[in-house]
Amino acid sequence: MSDPRERIPPGNSGEETIGEAFEWLNRTVEEINREAVNHLPRELIFQVWQRSWEYWHDEQGMSQSYVKYRYLCLMQKALFMHCKKGCRCLGEGHGAGGWRPGPPPPPPPGLA
């Protein structure tokens, strides 16, 4: 009889380093910011970052990586809800309250 337990998928041996995890986190935050500016108001993106930093880092004393993780979770949820409501941003553009004209926003503090 074969072993019923799951096998570790190739490439996921558990040998990844913590440094690779931090690199992934930084890359993913930058990628979600680049995508978010196509769908959400710049002001909202900045406010989510600022509030995440103020609460998780300044008030709760959490690490910069933890702040990025929580920010990433919030932005993923915001983009999911935006798309679930029927995103038409790339085809028809934003309606009132959506994307503001102008240059792309600067990266959130701590990510430059």
From Swiss-Prot:
* UniProt-listed InterPro entries: Lentiviral_Vpx_assoc_factor (IPR053711), RetroV_VpR/X (IPR000012)
Q: Which family does it belong to?
A: Belongs to the lentivirus VPX protein family.
BP GO annotations: symbiont-mediated suppression of host innate immune response; viral life cycle
| Entry keyword annotation includes rRNA-binding | no
Which gene name does the record give?
vpx
User: Might you report a single GO cellular component term?
Assistant: host cell nucleus
Keywords on record: Host nucleus, Host-virus interaction, Inhibition of host innate immune response by virus, Viral immunoevasion, Virion
Q: Where in the cell is it found?
A: Virion; Host nucleus
Oligomer status and interactors? Interacts with the P6 region of unprocessed GAG. Interacts with host VPRBP/DCAF1, leading to change substrate specificity of the CUL4A-DDB1 E3 ligase complex.
Q: List cystine links.
A: none
Explain the purpose of this protein: Plays a role in nuclear translocation of the viral pre-integration complex (PIC), thus is required for the virus to infect non-dividing cells. Targets specific host proteins for degradation by the 26S proteasome. Acts by associating with the cellular CUL4A-DDB1 E3 ligase complex through direct interaction with host VPRPB/DCAF-1. This change in the E3 ligase substrate specificity results in the degradation of host SAMHD1. In turn, SAMHD1 depletion allows viral replication in host myeloid cells by preventing SAMHD1-mediated hydrolysis of intracellular dNTPs necessary for reverse transcription.
Give the protein name, as stated in the record. Protein Vpx
Q: Does the keyword Ion transport apply?
A: no
Any Pfam family matching the protein: VPR
Tell me what organism the protein belongs to.
Simian immunodeficiency virus (isolate Mm251)
Task: Place the motif Nuclear localization signal on the sequence.
Answer: 65-72
- Its main subcellular localisation, reduced to a broad class, is virion
Q: Which domain of life is it from?
A: Viruses
